[in-house]
Amino acid sequence: MRYFRLCIISLLATLPLAVHASPQPLEQIKLSESQLSGSVGMIEMDLASGRTLTAWRADGRFPMMSTFKVVLCGAVLARVDAGDEQLERKIHYRQQDLVDYSPVSEKHLADGMTVGELCAAAITMSDNSAANLLLATVGGPAGLTAFLRQIGDNVTRLDRWETELNEALPGDARDTTTPASMAATLRKLLTSQRLSARSQRQLLQWMVDDRVAGPLIRSVLPAGWFIADKTGASERGARGIVALLGPNNKAERIVVIYLRDTPASMAERNQQIAGIGAALIEHWQR
């Protein structure tokens, strides 16, 4: 009996100590929900095959917030591919067209901005006025929703303009998506024939150049890893990110994380999303 116990002790000594390991992705999400006192929706999808690798509340509705800007610029690029729009076309606007948080567009009242520059501002700096100007070119919220239906997304909906679309009222279906629908739509835009190869590269590059996502998954990204992303935020308890990730500077997976109905501060929301991202990456590397 003593020999048996010694064998068990010796065997246990060779096993990795779980207390030193980061939580598994789903364990981290459950922990995040507890600490946030809110809901988390997440999906991890293989970019090439579309296979779901990890999911939590993936079919639940969450406010899109500024993550919709990726889909918006996808719709703009589809119009470019169809010959109905040009990235070089200049759009002029007035002071009354500006809304809160327009760090790029507010500097170009005198000279205007091209469609391509507006997309870059909307994605890389989350410029709200740039998004509204682009939204007008695709038929407004109804036009963008119609585009989504055309590419097979029957869930995601945009109902309002910036900045009202960030209201994020509990239980409100307006301006929402699900992690699963957003991931599938992003995959269609970047891998299918919905966009030309040139437009796919352009959309991805705008996401690579994102300059306002530092505190989220980028903060835990290992050296040499690829990331292209777009974040969203609301003052009413919501936060989100859509991202493409992969080692060896290659996009291999889509990760979508949304938070809703949390009283946590923005810094706490950022920290929880970073923690979920870190758990996904560590699990990936095993």
UniProtKB/Swiss-Prot annotation:
InterPro entries attached to this UniProt entry: Beta-lactam/transpept-like (IPR012338), Beta-lactam_cat (IPR045155), Beta-lactam_class-A (IPR000871), Beta-lactam_class-A_AS (IPR023650)
Hydrolase as UniProt keyword: yes
Residues annotated as binding substrate: 230-232
The family this protein is said to belong to: Belongs to the class-A beta-lactamase family.
Active site: 66, 164
GO biological process: beta-lactam antibiotic catabolic process; response to antibiotic
Single GO molecular function: beta-lactamase activity
Enzyme class (EC, first level): hydrolase
Keyword Transmembrane applies: no
Keyword terms of this UniProt record: Antibiotic resistance, Disulfide bond, Hydrolase, Plasmid, Signal
Name the UniProt record assigns to this protein: Beta-lactamase SHV-34
Any further remark recorded for this protein: The class A beta-lactamase family has a specific amino-acid numbering system, sometimes called Ambler or ABL numbering and often misspelt as Amber. A multiple sequence alignment was used to derive a consensus sequence and then the consensus was numbered taking into account insertions and deletions. This allows use of identical numbers, e.g. for active site residues, despite differences in protein length. UniProt always uses natural numbering of residues, hence there appear to be differences in numbering between this entry and some papers.
Function: Hydrolyzes ceftazidime and cefotaxime.
